[in-house]
Amino acid sequence: RLQPLLPPPPSHARGGAPRTVSDRACMAAILFMARTSTPWTLLPVGEFGCGSVTSCWRRFAEWAHAGVFERLQEALLDELGQAGQLDWSRVSVDSFSLRAVRGGPGGRKPGRPGQARIQAAPGVDGGGLPLSLLVTAANINDGLVFEALLGDIPAVRTPAGGRRCRPDKCHADKAYDHRRCRSYLTRRGIKVRIARCGIESSDRLGRHRWKAERSIAWLAGCRRLRIRYDRDSERFFAFAMLACDRLCYNRLPCATSARLP
């Protein structure tokens, strides 16, 4: 699944020796980095057979720049859609923030002065599988990225052979209780299920919105998403998409005997 999505090796004017480290070994090391949040300098390259830390890091930087992990998620969603594993009856959106200890594009979250933070917002289907993901500064209101979050849901194949990117309903908490968000859902023909400020209780997540919280906990299983150590936004987003790819792959029917750790 990954090999057809990889970009060709970069060419240099001076030439050079061909690559001897396999893409599979580098991918295993990158997945280890995402799961454990180990510093690059402490990567056990001998266990994965990926040559050196520099070789693995360069391969990851090339793949992140080429958008390999985003395209991998689309390919996995296509397989899940054809197998009937996606629940389009509803989609739930939520966000979570994390510290950016080395700075980078972002902002300070209100109420937490002195801490640079970023915010990640996943959109999940009725079963909790991530369909889209956005990474923004922590001081940006959730409602401002609502349209972009739903608009990033790719057109996924269905068991009937067509493609679909529009859910029947959208569930969200009070952070998305804006006229802009409700109007956007109405224009797209999506039923509005957004908690209203001053009406719905904050003590309960509801019968469906809890799945977004559960998906956030699943994503946090990749420790690289608990604290941001990467200064480069492109590489951090690649790690976030890799966490989504891991969830999608483990839901495939063929992955019952070969689940990713």
Region locations from a protein language model:
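Short alpha-helical elements
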Residues: 1-261
